[in-house]
Regions:
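Pyridoxal 5′-phosphate
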Residues: 1-405
Length: 405
């Protein structure tokens, strides 16, 4: 089998290539807006115009008011601000209990752990075996001193989409603020903050073909988590620091483009996703899909290959020019099994052999077929050299023979 002449990039959940239009806007802002957007003279006003335009574009994409949108450095900062800022605000009302899921992004998980060390209490809701959080489980966990419910909109590893609207309704019924980490959702599926009914929502530009180092936090009017960064009066006095003018301009343009063609993008990525899932599960023995098939992000495939280590598969794929991952890029240096897979009941030894493939609008059916061709060659060859796989097959054969006696 011959390698493709170009690199096949299938790790769009980790980061996405910057859209040419967004890059063009970034260069335009860098070369043309040399002033500080807080300054009261012509070049300062020019810089502020880039910021205002970017803010309006992002707000429109999620059906928010520009005044409800605050720029940050990334999705992780937005998550930290929403969780810790709410905790510090509500602690003044003696509300020191928070609710989240057991398979959130580490920006949420580690923020919650930090709050626990400060004396806050956190309830972690276990997802179903298919990777969904049930609103009734959230409601059962709410207490009189609950300050916040934070449930991600779409899981970054297995792609399952959560019933955020229903969970928000439960939270509000009990007077609790609702936050969702929508980093994987914004630009990938429709996101309407009014329809969802959330109080806060996190996003990150580099997940929808914008630049790295740009994020935002939506805060519904009247919802103010305590500042984490103090200093100047930027972002309506809620997030100090001179704005990243070029990053904001590029973020706005990228999201404008992503949402303008969202239906076509979703249909295209869903076709690639379903092709890979169906073919791999049919042709590779004991391959298993992690997470339910619906509702699921259009671009997400997460499959376990028992008997193998994901890192081994990753290296083989790289040799064939395919870029993929074994899970979250934010935890790629760790050899620990994925907390996401463990939370949905995937055994540790199977979780170690999991691969995540995530598509973007630039990917083609030819690339999806090439991925399957490579997997159908690599997996059997690696299993033939795997003591873990061969031992498991021998054990299964012995049980089968005993059953026939």
């Amino acid at each position: 089998m011959e390698n493709m002449e170009k690199v096949v990039y299938l790790d769009n959940a980790a980061t996405t290539p910057c859209a040419p239009e967004a890059l063009e806007m970034m260069v335009k802002a860098l070369s043309g807006a040399c002033g500080n957007p807080s300054s009261h003279y012509s070049v300062g006003y020019e810089a502020k115009e880039f910021v205002d335009t970017g803010r309006a574009q992002v707000a429109k994409a999620i059906n928010a008011s520009p005044a409800e949108l605050f720029f940050t450095s990334c999705g992780s900062e937005s998550d930290n601000w929403a969780v810790k800022g709410t905790a510090f605000t509500k602690a003044r009302q003696n509300k020191k209990h928070l609710i989240t899921s057991a398979f959130e992004h580490h920006a949420i998980m580690h923020s919650m752990a930090a709050l626990e060390r400060m004396g806050f209490e956190v309830t972690y809701i276990k997802p179903t075996s298919e990777g969904y959080i049930r609103p009734e489980d959230v409601e059962a966990a709410i207490r009189p001193d609950t300050a916040l419910v934070s449930i991600m909109m779409a899981n970054n590893e297995i792609g399952t989409i959560q019933p955020i609207k229903e969970i928000a309704e439960v939270a509000h019924k009990h007077g609790v603020w609702m936050h969702t980490d929508a980093v994987q959702a914004v630009g990938a599926i429709p996101v309407d903050v009014k329809e969802l009914g959330v109080d806060m929502l996190s996003m990150s530009a580099h997940k929808f073909n914008g630049p790295n180092g740009m994020g935002a936090l939506y805060c519904r009017k009247g919802v103010w988590p305590q500042n984490l960064i103090d200093g100047g009066s930027q972002e309506a006095r809620h997030r100090a620091g001179t704005e990243n003018v070029a990053g904001i301009a590029a973020m706005g343009k990228a999201l404008e483009i992503a949402t303008a063609h969202l239906d076509e993008r979703m249909a295209h990525e869903s076709e690639l996703r379903d092709y890979v899932i169906d073919r791999v599960l049919k042709n590779i023995p004991e391959a298993r899909l992690n997470g339910g098939r619906s509702p699921r992000l259009p671009n997400n495939v997460n499959i376990s290959f028992p008997g193998l280590e994901g890192e081994t598969i990753l290296l083989d794929l790289d040799m064939h020019g395919i870029c993929a991952s074994t899970g979250s890029a934010c935890n790629s240096d760790s050899l620990d099994p994925s907390h996401v897979l463990l939370s949905i009941g995937v055994p540790e030894e199977i979780g170690h052999g999991s691969m995540r493939f995530t598509f973007g609008p630039q990917n083609t059916m030819e690339e999806a077929k090439y991925l399957c061709d490579v997997l159908e060659e690599v997996i059997p060859r690696r299993r033939a050299m795997s003591c873990m796989w061969l031992q498991g097959q021998n054990t299964a054969r012995q049980f089968s023979l005993k059953g026939e006696q």
